[in-house]
Amino acid sequence: MPASYEIHRAQIEAILLGWGMPEDNAARTAEILSWADLHGVDSHGMSMLPGYDRLRRNKRIRIDAQPVILRETPVSALVDGGGGLGHVPAQFAMATAIAKARKAGMAAVAVRNSAHFGACGFYTLMAAEAGLVGMACTSAGGIQVAPTFGRQAKLGTD
């Protein structure tokens, strides 16, 4: 019998809290990971936890990181993710973009210094639910694939 969404989300949150992630960040990250699993994006849901744990244990991410705005204008912002997982900074960035777009008609917000941010569709859905057009993208984790008809890897996958 499949677990309920709330049990699924709560289990992920418990793991993140056990790692030392602040409560609000753990709840938000668990929501995004659970959303991915619920929407069939299994590659970006709870299956990511072992990889995130390796990053944490190898001190490649800060589990207690908090996003901060480094620079902003009425239509843009640059967010620093503090070296942590990317879910919370990405959600924060989209919420910032939505607020700015409501006032100015459009906005662009970038995030730097963060790790994997999960399923991109979660963030674009935030904009759609706000009645806006939204776009989210990420950088690639290195050269991994060959371009169409190419023989050598030259591109990242994101």
What are these regions (language model features)?
Residues 106-158:
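Glycine-rich anion/phosphate-binding loop at the beta-strand->alpha-helix junction
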Residues 21-26:
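Helix N-cap / loop-to-helix initiation motif
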Residues 1, 32-35:
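N-terminal amphipathic/basic leader segments beginning at the initiator methionine
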Residues 35-49:
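N-terminal amphipathic, basic helical "cap/leader" segment at the start of enzyme domains
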